[in-house]
Regions:
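Helicase-associated low-complexity/disordered flanking segments
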Residues: 1-80, 87-90, 148
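Conserved P-loop/Walker A NTP-binding site and adjacent catalytic elements of P-loop NTPases
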Residues: 53, 57-190
Length: 190
């Protein structure tokens, strides 16, 4: 009775195409199930990656950290972002999920932290994204012995830890709410 009244079809069972790992069958099943709700379909063909060399001016320890993590070259959009940022241009990068956007901003930030003592403030809308970014920065810093410190500064950061974040962080990762509630009203402490 509930399914008949529901807007959504029943959830797929834990067997069949998904359990078998057959993606084509899964997609075909979803298309059949949601045929009245699908208004269009577009398939984009696979495209080979385009690559570029690491920038020669990249701080050597940062280049070594990338190599330690298996990154010996950049995608062309990462290198293009590097070139624009280093030239002082405002830069927006729009690429698909999992295409390496993180390095587009982490490379210039880490390079500036290592060569100029620069600090950075990262804003993310969710705690999960913030934690992922801190983990990524920490792993890269540790891989190259960079000593760059990234910390989360959010509503769950204990009061005694907030001072440490303010004084020791090279990269502070927070969210818009915390920026307005906990950082801007106390900007003189930063």
């Amino acid at each position: 009775m509930l399914e008949a009244l529901s807007e959504e079809p029943a959830a797929p069972e834990d067997e069949g195409p998904l359990a078998a790992g057959d993606v084509d069958s899964l997609v075909a099943g979803l298309k059949r199930r949601y045929r009245t709700r699908i208004t269009g379909e577009q398939v984009q063909p696979e495209a080979p990656g385009r690559y570029a060399d690491l920038p020669p001016e990249l701080e050597p320890r940062l280049a070594a950290a990338l190599n330690a993590r298996g990154v010996s070259r950049l995608y062309s959009h990462q290198r293009e972002a590097w070139d624009h940022v280093r030239a002082g241009r405002h830069t927006v990068v729009v690429t698909p999920t999992a295409s390496g956007k993180t390095l587009c901003y982490n490379l210039p930030v880490l390079h500036a932290a290592l060569t100029e003592g620069a600090k950075a403030l990262y804003l993310f809308p969710t705690k999960a994204l913030s934690q992922d970014q801190v983990a990524e920065l920490t792993e890269l810093s540790q891989a190259g012995g960079l000593g760059v410190r990234a910390f989360t500064f959010d509503g769950d950061t204990p009061g005694d830890a907030r001072k440490a974040v303010r004084t020791r962080a090279d990269v502070v990762v927070t969210n818009p709410d915390m920026l307005h509630q906990g950082i801007l009203p106390h900007h003189t402490r930063w």
